[in-house]
Regions:
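Short, compact, well-ordered microdomains
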Residues: 75-109
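Short amphipathic alpha-helical segments and their helix-coil junctions
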Residues: 7-16, 69-86
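Residue-level detector of well-ordered alpha-helical segments, enriched
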Residues: 26, 30, 53, 72, ...
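Core of compact, soluble alpha-helical bundle domains
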Residues: 2-67
Length: 109
């Protein structure tokens, strides 16, 4: 099993706790899109307690990657923080929740 597959298995397990019917193919694409950041223990997590990090997710992911407005991005990030209550929030799972919430799965098609 590759390092990527090991990480993906961890993210799949975390996502199944939130949504038993989750789209694992989409999670795989979101994870692939994050590149080498998933291998760094600091960058592969999201801290909902840090406003600057949430702003960065909104700007770099919601607005630039998914192409939504700042307001839509802010709402989706807040919704993901509410839904994903684990202390250590895996970035791929967090981004997956945002993508699904905004209905932007087509970005990864």
């Amino acid at each position: 099993m590759s390092k990527f597959d090991e990480k993906l298995a961890t993210y799949e397990a975390a996502l199944k706790k939130l949504d038993a019917d989750a789209d694992m193919a989409l999670l795989r694409k979101v994870t692939k899109g994050l590149g080498p950041s998933i291998y760094n223990n600091d960058s592969n997590k999201v801290a909902c307690s840090q406003k600057t990090e949430l702003d960065r997710v909104n700007t770099n992911y919601c607005q630039k990657k998914l192409g939504v407005s700042a307001e839509e991005g802010e709402r989706a990030v807040a919704a993901a923080c509410e839904k994903y209550t684990e202390r250590a929030k895996h970035r791929p799972v967090f981004y997956y929740l945002i993508c699904k919430d905004l209905g932007k799965e087509s970005v990864y098609a």
